[in-house]
């Protein structure tokens, strides 16, 4: 466990701007240089442990995500029609009901038809719902155990949701597959499916639909989905025509590195010293 912890302690966060503003950014640093959350954080810590980049802490509403179109792929708050995006509170839920994030070095290729769903990918890294009891923070790299997957249909595209638990959670040793989640946390799976079904309704969109009638896939399928999306990332990372700045040539751009290093830091701490819940904002008029 100590060696696993050491694997992620080599990464630090540099936060510029403030949450709830368009200038908010979280950069990933290694050896005092900015790196890419998407390309440079490894997918795994060992054969059974995956690295998850936390984008949205549990119970919060700001829609933050890794930006695939920005140099070094920082996390930023998403914009739509020039306005910052938030997820509405859909009764009885408050914000996101798990720590939500992405698996680095994975890509749901929009040019490839998924063998299970028969639909193309959504063009993003794989999403992760981390179901542990602790509340993460934006940019935190959590080491997680994969448990299963839920297939969401997003505007005619495949949008997998990987369910996982922080390996440091007390329940992690008891949860080894999606069936264990059903037995130990019986309300979590139906609530997760319900949340994804209704969360866009306050924005005037219809109820979301699922592949496989909303049934969860077991760990073995989830691991296979991850392996496929990791392969898509490997194959496509040099095809710059697919995603602007997808190829990580920016790591050698000295001027760009100096520009990012010169940005005013709001927070710059080792993850082990970071406050457990630094972002709690009451968002009005949702």
From Swiss-Prot:
InterPro entries: Pyrophosphatase (IPR008162), Pyrophosphatase_sf (IPR036649). The keyword Hydrolase applies. Its main location: cytoplasm. Its cofactor is Mg(2+). Pfam families: Pyrophosphatase. Mg(2+) 2 binds at residue 127. It catalyses: diphosphate + H2O = 2 phosphate + H(+). CDD domains: pyrophosphatase. GO terms for biological process: phosphate-containing compound metabolic process. GO terms for cellular component: mitochondrion. One of its GO terms (molecular function) is magnesium ion binding. It is found in: Cytoplasm. The keyword tRNA processing does not apply. Mg(2+) 1 binds at residues 122, 127, 159. PROSITE patterns: PPASE. PANTHER family: INORGANIC PYROPHOSPHATASE (PTHR10286). Belongs to the PPase family. This is Putative inorganic pyrophosphatase C3A12.02. It comes from Schizosaccharomyces pombe (strain 972 / ATCC 24843) (Fission yeast).
